[in-house]
A protein has these predicted regions:
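Conserved polymerase palm-domain catalytic core
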Residues: 35-134, 138-155, 163-168, 172-173, ...
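Long, hydrophobic, well-ordered secondary-structure blocks that form the structural core
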Residues: 23-34
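PAPS/PAP-binding and catalytic site of the sulfotransferase fold
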Residues: 4, 154, 158
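Residues immediately flanking
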Residues: 6, 57-59, 183
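Right-hand nucleic-acid polymerase module
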Residues: 2, 91-94, 148-149, 165-263
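Electropositive, glycine- and tryptophan-enriched low-complexity nucleic-acid-binding patches
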Residues: 2, 6-22
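Generic structural signal for hydrophobic core residues of well-folded globular domains
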Residues: 7-8, 12, 91, 141, ...
């Protein structure tokens, strides 16, 4: 799978992706998605001020709901080797419906499924302030009525491929901030863009530290746990949460210190 994705599929399947598709694209990811949101908010403020609206969308049971035949038809437009296409179809058909979770081939295919909608939002509706990470996406606009109409268009486009928005989808004032990729990003009245950690992410971090402690007591390697924690820490430090991270650092040190004292 790794050789298939890295050696062949990646270039073929990512070719039609828009700039603001962040998942499973080299050089992008969550950090890029957050940076682009900050850029968009700054640009929006300079053009329109602090008043505006956000359409925030999420798709119901995305991976499980993707039509296998439809996504394979889309892939055929870009995969020029019949043998590779046959192997890709074999991976997709490992489950009776949707895309198999955990397979590397599923990530670019899931992105490809929404590619036409991406282009329609960007190029037909001319939405500059649009970003998507897999099935989580937002549009910032000055006109609430425009976003209501756009939501109907998105719903129709999704229905045509057997998908639908979930109940979390909503239109709300830009002043509320946008929850995206584990953070809430908002603008002050003066146009300063601020990023803070979501409460759910804080809770997940605390649970993660308890899990690290249990892993360490069960015999997991110190280096393995530290590597996992550093990766999570690097992502969370993109928000305004230095105090929280310092407390978590101290807790991690205590875990290793207590174990060493008991040896």
């Amino acid at each position: 799978q790794n050789a298939l994705v890295d050696g062949l599929l990646y270039d073929w399947l990512t070719k039609p992706f828009i700039r603001d598709c962040y998942s499973s694209v080299k050089g992008r990811g969550t950090s890029d998605g957050l940076a682009r949101l900050k850029l968009f908010m700054g640009e929006y403020y300079r053009c329109h001020g602090a008043e505006g609206w956000v359409l925030k969308c999420d798709i119901h049971h995305y991976f499980d709901s993707i039509d296998q035949s439809d996504v394979l038809r889309r892939a055929e437009r870009y995969v020029s080797d019949a043998r590779v296409m046959a192997l890709l179809a074999k991976y997709v058909r490992l489950t009776s419906h949707g895309l198999p979770l955990g397979l590397r081939t599923s990530q670019p295919l899931a992105n490809l499924e929404l590619c036409e909608i991406d282009h329609r939002i960007k190029e037909v509706y001319r939405c500059r302030y649009y970003g998507r990470y897999m099935d989580d996406f937002y549009i910032i606009h000055s006109d609430k009525a425009f976003l209501k109409e756009l939501r109907r268009e998105i719903e129709a486009g999704l229905a045509a491929i057997g998908l639908r928005l979930n109940d979390k989808t909503q239109i709300f004032p830009l002043a509320h901030g946008i929850e995206f990729l584990g953070f809430r990003t908002y603008m002050t009245d003066t146009g300063k863009v601020v990023r803070v950690l979501r409460q759910t992410a804080k809770t997940a971090l605390k649970r993660g530290i308890k899990r690290y402690e249990a892993m360490y007591r069960a015999g997991a390697a110190h280096g393995e746990i530290q590597q996992s924690y550093r990766s999570r820490r690097a992502h969370l430090m993109q928000g305004n949460c230095r105090g929280l991270m310092l407390r978590c650092d101290a807790k991690m040190e205590d875990i290793f210190k207590e174990e060493n004292m008991n040896e």
